[in-house]
């Protein structure tokens, strides 16, 4: 499960996209989000520049036979499908453009807080009873808690701004860079939530 989250995060933080036939930079943004909302990395790869190897690594991680990892992956896919976005500003200067996008998406932080709190209590009990906590047992326990907590934790949304830097090459607009907020948008705020837990 950790490998999947890490692979997805690495992929999203290294995005460098190119549109196949975009007349406007906004079209490139639409192409990106249309594939991203489907968690369609093959579709995203078609508009990427020099990311073939990263894409292959992603597919390898996503091709999992572990039911627990698949459950988490399905959760992220379902959340991604609910992303909404609005292009708030488009500033074009010659062959350069800055596109500011407001994204609304599911915030997994409340669910993660509940999972961590219960897991911590259970792991202390297991430790005192002498039970061996393998990675497999830990993952199984976390997903079991996740399934239970999803029944009671209310689905909440958060809004973040993503800024895309675009450039025009050969009459096509490409995304040359994007800020790190895009990873939170596509991974239900897991990146920020994970950092907060690590620092607490």
Regions found by a protein language model. Name each.
Residues 21-67, 71-87:
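Core segments of small alpha/beta cavity-forming domains
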Residues 119-137, 152-198:
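Short beta-strand edge/turn micro-motifs at domain boundaries
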Residues 104-122:
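Short, cysteine-centered beta-strand-loop-beta hairpins and adjacent loop/turn segments enriched
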């Amino acid at each position: 499960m950790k490998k999947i989250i890490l692979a997805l995060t690495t992929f999203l933080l290294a995005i460098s996209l190119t549109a196949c036939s975009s007349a406007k930079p906004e079209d490139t943004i639409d192409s990106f989000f249309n594939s991203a909302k489907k968690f369609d990395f093959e579709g995203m790869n078609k508009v990427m520049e020099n990311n073939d190897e990263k894409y292959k690594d992603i597919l390898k991680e996503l091709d999992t036979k572990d039911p627990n990892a698949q459950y988490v992956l399905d959760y992220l896919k379902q959340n991604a499908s609910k992303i909404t976005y609005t292009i708030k500003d488009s500033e074009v200067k010659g062959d350069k453009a800055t596109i500011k996008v407001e994204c609304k998406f599911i915030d997994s932080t409340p669910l993660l807080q509940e999972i961590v709190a219960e897991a911590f209590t259970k792991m202390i009990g297991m430790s005192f009873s002498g039970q061996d906590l393998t990675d497999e047992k830990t993952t199984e326990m976390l997903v079991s808690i996740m399934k239970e907590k999803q029944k009671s934790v209310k689905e909440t949304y958060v809004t973040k701004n993503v800024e895309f830097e675009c450039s025009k090459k050969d009459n096509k607009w490409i995304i040359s860079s994007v800020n790190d907020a895009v990873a939170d948008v596509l991974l239900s705020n897991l990146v920020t939530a994970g950092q907060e837990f690590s620092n607490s």
